[in-house]
Amino acid sequence: MNQEDAQRWFAAYLTEFEALGRGDADRRRILDHYGVPLLVSTEHGPMFFADAEQVLGVIGRQLDGMRAEGYARTEELASETTLLNPTCAVHRGRFARLRADGTEVARVEATYVITEGDGGPRISALLVHSG
């Protein structure tokens, strides 16, 4: 993986995430983008998900909440991708989650650790920033 590969992969992930957030795609497809195991860190503390069902559960709850708020799409407000080595990149981004009418559902800032293994690139850690 090089930096351009990581950026292209993240853009494809974001497109898929939008479809999942709207309910337009089978939520099991999230496993094409999130690694197992998965580390998620929020202001409430770190959480470690050791199997596919746990990953589907945590990401599924996030998607359900977005859908309940009328989520339609995400606008990436700022981002930076850094290649750490040939199998690992970090993507940091600030995002606006929007409804179909353009009103904002939420703003999110997060860092994604993307690792490349036998199944291709996956998000191995999702680090949600406070504030």
PLM region descriptions:
Residues 105-131:
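Short beta-strand edge/turn micro-motifs at domain boundaries
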Residues 1-33:
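Short, low-complexity N-terminal intrinsically disordered segments enriched in polar/charged residues
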Residues 97-105:
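Short, cysteine-centered beta-strand-loop-beta hairpins and adjacent loop/turn segments enriched
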